[in-house]
Amino acid sequence: MYKFIKYISIYIKKLFFLNISFFKKVISIFQVDNILFLKKSSQELLKLSRVTLPKKFFVLINSEVLNRGKLCVRKGDLVLRGQTLTLGCGNIVSIHSPTSGRIIDVINNYIFFLDQFFAVVIVESDGRDLWISRTPICNYTQFSSKKLINLIYHSGILGLSGSGFSTSKKLQCAVGKVHTLVVNAVESEPCVTSDDCLIQNFSKEIIDGCKILIWILKIKKILIVVSEEKIIAFNVLKKSVINLKDFELLKVKNKYPSGSSKKLIQILFNKEIPQGKHAIDLGIIMYNVATVFAIKKAILDGEPLTERVITLYGDKFLPSKNVLVRIGTPISHLMKIYKLNEKTLKVNIGGPITGLLIRNFNFSVLKTNNCIMFVSIQNNELNNFEEKNCIRCAACSYSCPMNLLPEQLYWYSKHSNHEKTQIYNIQDCIECGICEQVCPSDIPLMSYYRREKKQISIAKFKNYQIKKFKNLFLLRKQRLNNLNSRKKNTIVSQYIALNKFNFKV
């Protein structure tokens, strides 16, 4: 039955978008109960609850930070909430302790589905949840943009919509170059309502975060974009910006993947970001609404990023919930709170389309996680298919909202042909997952693309290092040659002077 729906979805998707609302109607006709494309409660008042603290936190840290000696704690150290565990390193932001307690251990671990090594700092909670001394900034207009950006950097804030790019780095590149700020509150992926809940509960704080960004970037136009289905969130924001001239509130259709930054810019401004360029080159900067909220907390409250709002969804056995959870909370703790059986469930980190399936329940909540789905093992049809050979049906090409050729990218990514994948613009892939959903051969296309992107970035970094050290070597060689030539000239001049003296004598 699901196979038949997959073929129907090819015709549902036309050129640019996958119409989720129509797709859900098709699913309801065929009565597929265990499909993951589920209805959002976008017209309901979303409540926000706080998750109780676990006994142990598992805070994941990029292994590059350890290699550069940026770790600030050792085994046995006592820490407070908000205390720096690791210093920032290039585009990698600082990591802070999610609670007060003691460092039990620091271990290296390979995260299989992320295909990367991480250091895990294990923090044992003392139950008191004591903060470090915080220094809120009430009048941020007395500070320069550079100082505020530096504070955001040390507060550990990054893109909370999934990109994970350093917020401060993005701000540094944008100062003096952009004229419009876009606050992205479009959650087009089914089941994910964390941003919707954040707006309904913290609209004033979000507006304050926008004002901070206006001061840093020195811009006069700000667009807050909301999906047309989020009626309550739109009305709440409308009341908050009613007397603010620089703010404009817009609605967009709930068509996946309209929440993607590249696609949203195309919808709002009818512009496409050129190959190898960024939105900043068009005079536009975009931030997720959760990132804006985190900026407000960092500047006005003096709180680094130690928690975030995520959506928990488990279909029949767990109604949709939005919870405020600490970074580093193990998923096993969430399952224990809501009495979910680990033996009968799988965990999907992220939404139903772009999420990653994991099997280790000790995996912890990351800063970039906005949704955790609990999927029944018996009814999980989406992950029970085996990968088969590509039949070149071109369903993925018809479905791609970025007008790429996923079929060609698949072949070249599979054989690690980096030159060809770059020619076919793999960097423009927004990883929406539509091509994977419509593929009749059940090929995990996103896995191939993510791995290829990572290999390309590693290769580029290696080439950069080679060129850098080659230039340093050439400069050193030039300095030595200059030094030798100066020595020779000195010896020759001394010899000539000595001969002249002897001749006079």
From Swiss-Prot:
Localization per Swiss-Prot or TrEMBL: Cell inner membrane
InterPro entries linked to this entry: 4Fe4S_Fe-S-bd, 4Fe4S_Fe_S_CS, Ion_transpt_RnfC/RsxC, Nuo51_FMN-bd, Nuo51_FMN-bd_sf, RnfC_N
PROSITE patterns xref list: 4FE4S_FER_1 (PS00198), 4FE4S_FER_2 (PS51379)
Enzyme class: translocase
Entry binding sites for [4Fe-4S] cluster 1: 390, 393, 396, 439
Domain named 4Fe-4S ferredoxin-type: residues: 381-410, 420-449
Predominant location category: membrane
Known EC number: 7.-.-.-
Binding positions for [4Fe-4S] cluster 2 per the UniProt entry: 400, 429, 432, 435
Cofactor note: Binds 2 [4Fe-4S] clusters per subunit.
Keywords of this entry: 4Fe-4S, Cell inner membrane, Cell membrane, Electron transport, Iron, Iron-sulfur, Membrane, Metal-binding, Repeat, Translocase, Transport
Description of how the protein assembles with itself and partners: The complex is composed of six subunits: RnfA, RnfB, RnfC, RnfD, RnfE and RnfG.
Function recorded in the entry: Part of a membrane-bound complex that couples electron transfer with translocation of ions across the membrane.
Family named by the database record: Belongs to the 4Fe4S bacterial-type ferredoxin family. RnfC subfamily.
PANTHER family recorded: ION-TRANSLOCATING OXIDOREDUCTASE COMPLEX SUBUNIT C
Name of the protein: Ion-translocating oxidoreductase complex subunit C
